[in-house]
Amino acid sequence: MLFFNFYKHIMFLPWVFCVALLTLNVCAVSYIAYDMSNAQELFNEFVVKYNKVYKDDQEKEARFEIFKQNLADINARNALEDSAMFEINSRADISSNELLQKLTGLKLSLMRGEKKNSFCTPTVISGDSSGKVPDSFDWRDRNSVTSVKMQKECGSCWAFSAVANIESLYHIKHNVSLDLSEQQLVDCDKVNNGCNGGLMSWAFEGIIRAGGISYEAPYPYTGVDGVCKNTTRYVQLSGCYAYDLRSEKKLRQVLHEKGPVSVAIDVVDLTNYKSGVAKHCSVDHGLNHGVLLVGYGQENDVKYWTLKNSWGSDWGEQGFFRIKRDVNSCGILNQFAASAILSSSS
């Protein structure tokens, strides 16, 4: 049996000193760094661990070069972050451009021109929260967040975010967990573009126009564009909210009172995320990924959001990730967030 231990190629380095008013206190905080001189061995282990197959030696060499770039990026992020960890994962041999093409799928261009949402109510989320909101809250604690799924190499994040939102709202209303079909949205939604991208608000519109959405079992996910199938649509929507997020304080209240929210972010800085609260997540690549906001809290004086991704449970914190709150991490404040409204019969 082969055992893979990337950590044997890691150096543990001192990170930061903490200074009190009159006393010097040294904080034992460390970060990890991969030994770049062992990049080839790390790559060989990576290829075997993740069953990577390349068409020829030329492609393998090109992937190794990308792997080294990602390795350097992981080291840089671990040196920068004192509350999160980044490490080699199954995506360590793809570039940022490939990530955007294959593993995201938010398509902002669908909101341009004359297209307008007919069923989603435009709602501005601004100002401070009104009423009492708990300091921390997570819908997973109420079992109202369904299992993490895998979108594969298909730009269908919009479908996964929208479906996850509906599944959560259904559980909140009925205390019943459902597994709904993302593939039906990929195949049948005529406004969004299947594996070539879409928006969560348009997904809700498509479900309303079609009369509902099917279960996963009769319409399983394939990760490729297919022909729309005529299956029974079990869950119906009566409307949706198209959120313009301007206040993270108010967003906290919306999340707590109404349920998980489909949000748009720039995910590139989190490609190799493993755990913890990422403090440094830019929007340099533009909004490109749809995920589900499920909770918030505070750890070691760092306020954070908790979000559900669609890259499988082996990524991040069992498929979830945390980013710093109240600093517009990953560009979370934008006008592309959305949430469904279940019909009275659903």
From Swiss-Prot:
One of its GO terms (molecular function) is cysteine-type peptidase activity. CDD domains: Peptidase_C1A. The gene is VCATH. Cysteine protease that plays an essential role in host liquefaction to facilitate horizontal transmission of the virus. May participate in the degradation of foreign protein expressed by the baculovirus system. Residues 29-133 form a propeptide. It is an enzyme of class 3 (hydrolase). Synthesized as an inactive proenzyme and activated by proteolytic removal of the inhibitory propeptide. The active site is at 157, 289, 309. Pfam families: Inhibitor_I29, Peptidase_C1. PANTHER family: CYSTEINE PROTEASE FAMILY C1-RELATED. Keywords: Disulfide bond, Glycoprotein, Hydrolase, Protease, Signal, Thiol protease, Zymogen. Glycans are attached at residues 175, 230. It comes from the Viruses. Belongs to the peptidase C1 family. This is Viral cathepsin. InterPro entries: Papain-like_cys_pep_sf (IPR038765), Pept_asp_AS (IPR025661), Pept_cys_AS (IPR000169), Pept_his_AS (IPR025660), Peptidase_C1A (IPR013128), Peptidase_C1A_C (IPR000668), Peptidase_C1A_papain-like (IPR039417), Prot_inhib_I29 (IPR013201). Residues 1-28 form the signal peptide. Disulfide bonds join 154-195, 188-228, 281-330. It catalyses: Endopeptidase of broad specificity, hydrolyzing substrates of both cathepsin L and cathepsin B. One of its GO terms (biological process) is proteolysis. Its EC number is 3.4.22.50.
